[in-house]
């Protein structure tokens, strides 16, 4: 799965909001409508999802110098491999390879290197 990347510097809309029918609530999404997730234990510079984890959980990335915009306040953090990842409340944001349609939240509650949670703004 290709990882969406902002190409221009400055501000860029990288997130939206949609209803996840399986969760019966609104979730934060990428610009393609795919649900965004956080991983328990990842916050303030601590990364657990690295290496092969990133195949199932692609990070939401932007180009260096880009200010991410969305329906909520977003930030950025530099990943261990040097890429810039979008954050919500200090937690890095990811999509899930098991979601292929808008509004799906198939990664909610999954446990591997921690527990994954759909972001509910």
Regions found by a protein language model. Give the residues of each.
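Compact beta-sheet-dominated domain cores in extracellular/mature segments
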Residues: 3-121
């Amino acid at each position: 799965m290709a990882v969406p990347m902002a190409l221009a510097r400055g501000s860029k809309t990288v997130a939206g909001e949609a209803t996840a029918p399986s969760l019966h609530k609104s979730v934060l999404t990428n610009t393609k409508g795919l649900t965004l997730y956080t991983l328990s234990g990842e916050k303030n510079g601590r990364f657990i999802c690295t290496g092969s984890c990133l195949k199932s959980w692609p990070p939401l990335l932007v180009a260096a110098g880009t200010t991410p915009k969305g329906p909520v306040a977003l930030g950025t953090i530099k990943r261990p491999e040097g890429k810039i990842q979008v954050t919500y409340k200090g937690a890095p944001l990811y999509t899930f390879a098991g979601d292929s349609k808008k509004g799906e939240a198939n990664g909610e509650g999954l446990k591997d290197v921690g527990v994954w949670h759909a972001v509910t703004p």
